[in-house]
A protein has these predicted regions:
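P-loop NTPase Walker
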Residues: 1-130
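DNA-processing P-loop NTPase/helicase core
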Residues: 46, 111-113, 118-167
Length: 167
């Protein structure tokens, strides 16, 4: 990908057991290894609280493992390298992994991996504030699932990458 065409959105959809957590963690880690402060500009959305917790734990533990050269993180390190420029040294990867880990742990509220429900709730709360509707706005989760299931289910069998480019 050239510097003129930077991906603003990457969307992965896949069935259970297909490696979504691994894939998302690798991509997230690659982004923050490239630029450690970018964690503040990344949003990962999952369907369940369990998936959210697993994703956060995986990213933090792999940043630690990569940064400290732990053998159990070698599969992540090799995949992360695929998304980094060739001139990115192993030492730079280690240093930036630890730097990103430190940034995230010291600014955890900006480590944005959340469920689709909490994402929509936050968006609606912001919209309500902008429209001066007060804080009584609530998201009805059953309705949200009825809305999102028909959208996401038909393409839930393969990983799809969608790119929106800056001209």
């Amino acid at each position: 990908m050239t510097k003129q065409k930077q991906s603003l959105l990457t969307l992965y959809k896949a069935s259970a057991g297909s490696g979504k957590t691994f894939t998302l963690a690798v991509r997230y880690i690659a982004m923050v290894v490239r630029e450690p402060s970018d964690y503040r500009h990344i949003l990962a959305v999952t369907f369940t609280n369990k998936a959210t917790a697993e994703m956060k734990q995986r990213i933090l533990s792999q940043l630690y493992g990569i940064g400290n050269g732990l053998p159990e993180s070698s599969s992540y390190l090799e995949k992360v390298k695929e998304f980094l420029p060739d001139n990115f040294s192993d030492n730079s990867i280690k240093v930036n992994a630890l730097k990103a880990l430190n940034f995230i742990l010291n600014d955890y509220s900006h480590f944005r991996i959340e469920t689709i429900d909490s994402f929509f709730q936050r968006v609606l709360n912001g919209l309500a504030r902008e429209l001066q509707l007060g804080s009584g706005l609530a998201l009805e989760l059953a309705s949200l699932h009825q809305f999102t299931t028909p959208i996401f289910t038909p393409i839930d069998t393969s990983i799809v990458e969608v790119h929106h480019y800056n001209p």
